[in-house]
Amino acid sequence: ESRELERLSRDAGTAVTARMYDAGRLSEVSPSLFARCRDRYADALDLAWRDLRYTGDGAHLDDIIAGLVDSLGGLGAGPRDVVEMHRQVLAARAEGLTQRQARALREEGRFLVLRVMGLLVDHYRRTALARVDAPTPPREAP
């Protein structure tokens, strides 16, 4: 699974499209901002995993994820950025865990990465709809 995540986050198949739109991986374009988002994602995963084990209420987790998605959306992050962030955090958090704990962490991570991706899509959809719904200023007569 780890190798597949790495392949997905580094797949060169979309490099041409990314260059066309002047988009690069967030970790390369702005390493410090990527690191901040990655740290927030790590906090979210830690909290989600803790809540799984101790049945917390998840309210604080929602706040962390919402802030993370707003940041990622504002930075123009894409799916590969989210997968790269997820892969790095999962690798760091899995060190020193038993196989059973690592499996539970990966499972919780799958839910989290899908949730973040879905919310990021919603963020972009809302942004696009806001542009479409925005009133256009009247044109001046020639």
Task: Mark where each language-model region is.
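Non-catalytic regulatory/interaction regions at protein termini and inter-domain linkers
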Residues: 1-142
